[in-house]
Amino acid sequence: MLDIKLIREKPELVKKDLIKRGETEKVKWIDEILELDRKWRENLKKINQLRKERNQLAVQIGKRKKAGEPIEDLLARSNEIVKQIEELEKEVEALKKKIDYYLWRLPNITHESVPVGKDDTENVPIRFWGKAKVWEGFLESFKEQSLGKMDYEVLSWRPRLHVDMLELLRGADLERAAKVSGSRFYYLLNELVILDLALIRFALDRLIEKGFTPVIPPYMVRRFVEEGATTFEDFEDVIYKVEGEDLYLIPTAEHPLAGMHANEILDGKDLPLLYVGVSPCFRKEAGTAGKDTKGIFRVHQFHKVEQFVYSRPEESWEWHEKIIANAEELFQELEIPYRVVNICTGDLGYVAAKKYDIEAWMAGQGKFREVVSASNCTDWQARRLNIRFRDKTHEKPKFVHTLNSTAIATSRAIVAILENHQTEEGVVKLPKALWKYTGFKEILPASMKEKCCQD
């Protein structure tokens, strides 16, 4: 939520930012907010003046009573003032509701470094890491996607898609999951179960080493938490509701972590607060019909390790760089080639002032796919959830800044591992960083395991 003071003092800045975001229909809202705010403040002033007059009347009534003089005229005026105040208070409340309606539906103000663009095709790659395995048929496309800035190894054989690897390894049962739960669900099987859990522990260990406090949050939260952490559109497109209850299944650990300190005033000396949340995530994926319908890349349920930071406003941009660096280190240890993308205004979403994505090279698909998002939400969530801090007892509290970043979303990390670390024979060679967590170094195709058993 935006600060009303910002709209009062810099309305043109807010309008220009809305235009950059492509939210041109909301530009007129700013003038409407200013007019409503003018009336709201005007009515508050009238209420204060009337209260002052009523207090003065009370003094006069007291004096007249002592003097034995009539007070009927003063009482009549006092009663009239009470009615006027009641009417004005109703108007003030109605005006406040209208102002809040707009404020709660305005996006965050973007950072000056965010590129202007209409959609994800105009996101800007800013750095690349790793040596990509590229099938010769994908080579020209790869060079274009990597801007010629990434090392690569040309393969004469085409790496399998992760969905084919799942079948080859007997690592998941999608058919039976569809029978039991519908589309975009899966049974994870055999070594991939161990791999999923290994990825969680791997990410947790690395972030705990960096001072993050591990948290398993509630998997359901109340509506006020979701309203504070995300946009109203997500209630239709993303979030599952528990019927008959004021509870929603979390789409990410970010949301219960954002709500953890709702309506609190934090001690400034405790900042930054660093949390690493571990949870399942539940998402409707409405509006994605036809996208990634096969496999486990885009699903209704998955595990995720999430970084969450409460910081001082002046430190939040430094922390934004730190949390994306943390995620990069994880994917470097997993030996997954990737690019970091600066998300443009048209793809940014309402919550973030700036967002980086890590897009892993998927050797089977021949394209980069999102595996991490890292956002600086500045004070947008903190205002909605009323999370403040102060350094001294009697100091006026200020709003914190909140930041979040994926560490590992296990299903997407598994997709990246299957597509990048497979051999021509279909063996998956696991990165060394995971060996101590899995207890094995490779995953064999089911047919090879059967043959080994027979031999």
UniProtKB/Swiss-Prot annotation:
Any single GO CC term annotated in Swiss-Prot or TrEMBL for this entry: cytoplasm
EC main group: ligase
EC number: 6.1.1.11
GO molecular function, one term: ATP binding
Subcellular compartments: Cytoplasm
InterPro entries per UniProt: aa-tRNA-synt_IIb, aa-tRNA-synth_II, aa-tRNA-synth_II/BPL/LPL, Ser-tRNA-ligase_type_1, Ser-tRNA-synth_1_N, SerRS_1_N_sf, SerRS_core, tRNA-bd_arm
CDD domains: SerRS_core
Superkingdom of the organism of origin: Archaea
Keyword entries, A-Z: Aminoacyl-tRNA synthetase, ATP-binding, Cytoplasm, Ligase, Nucleotide-binding, Protein biosynthesis
Function of the protein: Catalyzes the attachment of serine to tRNA(Ser). Is also able to aminoacylate tRNA(Sec) with serine, to form the misacylated tRNA L-seryl-tRNA(Sec), which will be further converted into selenocysteinyl-tRNA(Sec).
Family to which the UniProt record says this protein belongs: Belongs to the class-II aminoacyl-tRNA synthetase family. Type-1 seryl-tRNA synthetase subfamily.
Name of the featured protein: Serine--tRNA ligase
Protein species of origin: Thermococcus gammatolerans (strain DSM 15229 / JCM 11827 / EJ3)
Name of the gene this protein is made from: serS
